[in-house]
């Protein structure tokens, strides 16, 4: 009985830690850059769905574009201050629109997460959690699969992507080979390490660059294209994967090394900042109890066998106890330079991404029915 209580208590701590109010602060010495106040911060509702996870601007600087929980990709019209439909990730749209719990239908309707434009063609590439790696032309519409069917079906949880503008190579992540997005808490609790970093090149070949990753998430190419930064959410760290073996500058395992670790929360997406370095969205802060739970995966696996809907538990808790933030890391050493977080009543449920464009921070969250816009 005592062992069962320990399992339940620790598992609840792990679930709640995704929104833990006692989260630890940054350890890299960054000062808080922004204390968000309502007059400074604009919330932009995403009509009909929620979860603007990631942002991207097109070749002309228009947008941003973002994917939503009902499978749509929408475009922001700045002059009209409204979103318009741009694309969908599947033509099977029956039952996808309108107010309902989209998590129950996202495996049918699609859930677009990472987005990136191929600037040479104008095509928008999409990492859809269920439909795999997709693309749609400059005028939008229904996206089509990029990979052969058998390869696309092998992707269990396509999450993020980036494109080399010089070569057209697409780098993308598959968060788990076991768990799908609608049960991502299971991947976190179980200690799953089946995530992969992959690439799709001009010869239409798919290559696995890294495997055995713990909930691999965001990916970003460096400014000069010599390395990738890859987020391991469950490990609260970021890896640097060198694309050119001659570029390795330190003692690393194979051709990757730890770029940043001990982050103050669970990292999600990562994007380059035009001011240098990388913005990392931290879904939520964590605590010492979180670290204990994450380092004892057997507890989480045991809890998954209990008759509890852990996704529902997490969803309800997160709704009322948000604690998201974002950090900007230095390009060379991964040191925290700036911190973005709300204060008091303006705390975020979660932050999945910060995209910086023309002096504005676009803030995304997989859980909210709005995007945030902050003028620096």
From Swiss-Prot:
First and last residue of the signal peptide: 1-23
Species name: Arabidopsis thaliana (Mouse-ear cress)
Gene Ontology CC annotations of this record: vacuole
Glycosylated residues (UniProt): 79, 244
Keywords on record: Glycoprotein, Signal, Vacuole
Similarity annotation: Belongs to the strictosidine synthase family.
Subcellular localization, as worded in the UniProt entry: Vacuole
Protein name per Swiss-Prot or TrEMBL: Protein STRICTOSIDINE SYNTHASE-LIKE 2
InterPro entries associated with the record: 6-blade_b-propeller_TolB-like, Strictosidine_synth_cons-reg
